[in-house]
Amino acid sequence: MSSLMTAVYGGGPFYTGGQPVIDDLKNSGFTTVVAWAVHVNSSGDLIYNDPTIVSNGQYVGDSSWPGLLANLKQGGSVNRLLFSIGGWGTGDFENIQALIQSQGTGPDSILYKNFQALKNAIPSIDGIDLDDESLYDQDTTVQFCQMLYGLGYQVTFCPYTMMSFWVNSLYALNSQTPGLVTGFNLQCYAGGAGNDPKDWIDAIQKKMGPDFDAAGFVFPGLWCRNGDGCTQGDCPDSITSQFKAWKPDGIQGGFIWLYDDIQKCENSGTCSGSMGTAAYASAIVQGLQG
């Protein structure tokens, strides 16, 4: 088994795909699965893409989902499950900010109650991934993350820009509570296509000090084959080449965006060789270990 962290983000199929999707992930070689995206509406409800899954302190999602997600981490390659909040064009973090300003983050607040209900219903969730692409408010981020940590969640950040915001938020959180934030899942595609993990590693190192393992904290991600005709994005072999180029930076893993597109394009024939889930997990490992 590799000690590298290999993650895959995915959306609807994780909720609607049933046991076949769970089995595909378990047999893939990916060590982390990130369910994307949880949205927080103005009343604090938690919505997984379209269906509401938590409301008024109660889990109201598909009753079979907690069992499927528990099974995900049993007997396969997956050892960590994250739920990601946000994305492009959502008001999730603005809603979180407004809810914190009106109710705080204590046990009586709806944010606390709903994230506690999520953890109680699906205890196999290890952490919450923050994909803030609009608000970038450090006070909101710090208060929200401290609440999540108190409920038993790890926290990861999923940045594509605004480096100083993310690095300063990391410092504010981890200088008070070492280990609260466990990594940056750095988008190196779409809006983040110009990102070089080394720049982020250097910025984290400078802020956090010489004893902090900045190289082991940044996990770059690439977008698999996608788009009309599956002609956009990366094939597994180009992902291997990119991770090989990043290997000297000392990174210890990476991620693939997006499982939905792996499913869509797996049989498109637009890459030489396999385009299945396992091929993409292997591509990261081959790049970093080859």
Tell what function each PLM region has:
Residues 2-240, 248-251, 260-289:
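Chitinase-like catalytic core of GlcNAc-active glycosidases
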Residues 257:
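Conserved, well-structured core segments
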